[in-house]
Amino acid sequence: MQPALAPHPSAQDHADQVLHDQLLAAQHQHLTHPQQARPQPPAPQPPHMQPNTPARDQNNIDPAISGATMLTGPPQTPTQPDVTGQETPKTYGKRPLSTSKRAAQNRAAQRAFRQRKEAHIRELEGKVKAYENMGEAIKALQAENYQLREYIINLQSRLLDSQGEVPELPGNIDLSQPRSEIPVPPIPNSGTTTTAAPPPTAPQQPQPPHAQAPTSNDDMNSLNRIAVAGLGMRKPPTEEANYLGNNFQAQARRVRPDEGQTEASELPKQEQTHGLPLIS
């Protein structure tokens, strides 16, 4: 076994010498050509020279070791830096684009949300203003309605005072009896004496006004009740009816004293039962 291993050191020395020569040549080439950006690496050259060395000593080198070195060693060293150098700019280029797009989308979504929110708020504010205006208009209409109702009641009272006639009522109220005026007899002179006895109906003439007044009061009360019910006043109908009835009664009282005076002035002149002249 020892004589077979004797030429192995000489082969290694020869390979080392070849590598040394190649390194010197590479350094000399680098010095002579300084303008090149990247000098040729000396590492890939030994694998090209390796097939010459094993050709000489194929019997001395283990095939398992030589196969592992030939398959695994050379292809890994040159490919790794190229792959990393090509992938790094792609990964760095994609990340800023994705983040910028996402940020732009977020800003656009926030802007659209703010616009929708502002539009909805403006719409609600417009509705609130419209409702406030409607409420004010309704209040003004209510106040005007109350004023018109009071004005109508005052007009009715004045019409009744000026005309003295009751307007037509529904069929459930009977007002078919006409109002008859009281006949006023002529006033005799004071110088002449009246010996004739008065007619038997003279003392009964003052009674029709007193009998007619309650009927007119009843008619006015019924008219007031119907008017208040038709208008739908907020006040109770009894208060309005009493108010109008009291006004009518007060006006009737203002008229009645004059009628009483005329009647009182006329009665002594007509009632002469004893047949003696009256001394004025």
Swiss-Prot record:
GO terms for cellular component: RNA polymerase II transcription regulator complex. GO terms for molecular function: DNA-binding transcription activator activity, RNA polymerase II-specific; transcription cis-regulatory region binding. Residues 39-49, 197-211 have a biased composition (Pro residues). Pfam families: bZIP_1. Signal peptide: none annotated. Keywords: DNA-binding, Nucleus, Transcription, Transcription regulation. The keyword Nucleus applies. PANTHER family: TRANSCRIPTION FACTOR KAPC-RELATED. This is Putative transcription factor kapC. The lineage of its organism: Eukaryota, Fungi, Dikarya, Ascomycota, Pezizomycotina.
